[in-house]
């Protein structure tokens, strides 16, 4: 610990080292959040045009994003209802009902954290992920809003990614985490165990 503390110019006590790394992690988190926001903002125009083109072809779209103001901007630009944190349950239900029952309501904008559980949005079979979450579980919960019982059409998930940006890093992280959570024992592993036991 003393050597590590000397390298970082900190007090050699464990508490001081933890505090030092916590401060570094906090700063990194702030930078990542800023990068995500900048990247999402850069994608807004393309996302709006993409949704309008899809709407012109008769497709209803669910657009998922992370940042509150990104969700609000999309909802305003596309004149669409939204599901966002802090809404009353009545507003959330009204937005959902409008999207599900009104044939002229072509888009629903959702906050990934506010709408990734407990909502059925099967009026659409297309989702645009503008900002991906960090975990495979949250990603799959979000996409499951349109891919669930009651969906009668094939589902397509569109991921809007800027190459060589924080987007690419997030999707690489999602891929790595997904691979790490795959079952360790497969059918071939079971067969090998059975073969070796004879």
Segments (PLM) and residue ranges:
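Conserved beta-strand segments of the P-loop GTPase G domain that flank and frequently precede/overlap
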Residues: 64, 110-111, 129-131, 159-161
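A conserved SF2-helicase RecA2
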Residues: 134-198
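A generic "structured core" feature
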Residues: 61-62, 98-99, 126-128, 134, ...
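A short beta-strand element within the Helicase C-terminal
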Residues: 119-132, 155-159
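Phosphate- and divalent-cation-binding pockets in alpha/beta enzyme and binding domains
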Residues: 70-74, 117-120, 138, 169
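Interdomain linker/hinge connecting the two RecA-like lobes of the SF2 helicase core
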Residues: 1-59, 66-68, 74-76, 177-197
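Conserved helicase ATPase core of P-loop NTP-dependent helicases/translocases
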Residues: 60-64, 72, 79-115
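Short beta->alpha connector loops at strand-helix junctions that form conserved
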Residues: 84-86, 130-133
């Amino acid at each position: 610990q003393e050597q590590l503390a000397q390298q970082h110019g900190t007090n050699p006590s464990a508490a001081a080292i933890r505090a030092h790394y916590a401060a570094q992690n906090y700063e990194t988190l702030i930078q990542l959040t800023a990068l995500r926001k900048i990247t999402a903002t850069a994608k807004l125009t393309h996302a709006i045009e993409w949704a309008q083109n899809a709407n012109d072809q008769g497709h209803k779209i669910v657009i998922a994003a992370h940042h509150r103001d990104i969700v609000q901007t999309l909802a305003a630009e596309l004149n669409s209802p939204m599901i966002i944190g802090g809404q009353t349950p009545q507003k959330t239900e009204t937005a959902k009902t409008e999207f599900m029952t009104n044939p002229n309501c072509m888009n629903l904008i959702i906050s990934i954290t506010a709408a990734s559980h407990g909502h059925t949005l099967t009026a659409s079979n297309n989702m645009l992920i503008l900002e991906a979450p960090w975990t495979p579980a949250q990603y799959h919960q979000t996409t499951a809003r349109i891919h669930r019982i009651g969906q009668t059409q094939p589902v397509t998930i569109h991921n809007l990614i800027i190459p060589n940006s924080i987007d690419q890093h997030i999707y690489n992280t999602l891929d790595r985490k997904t691979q790490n959570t795959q079952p360790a024992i497969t059918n071939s592993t079971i067969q090998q165990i059975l073969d070796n036991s004879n």
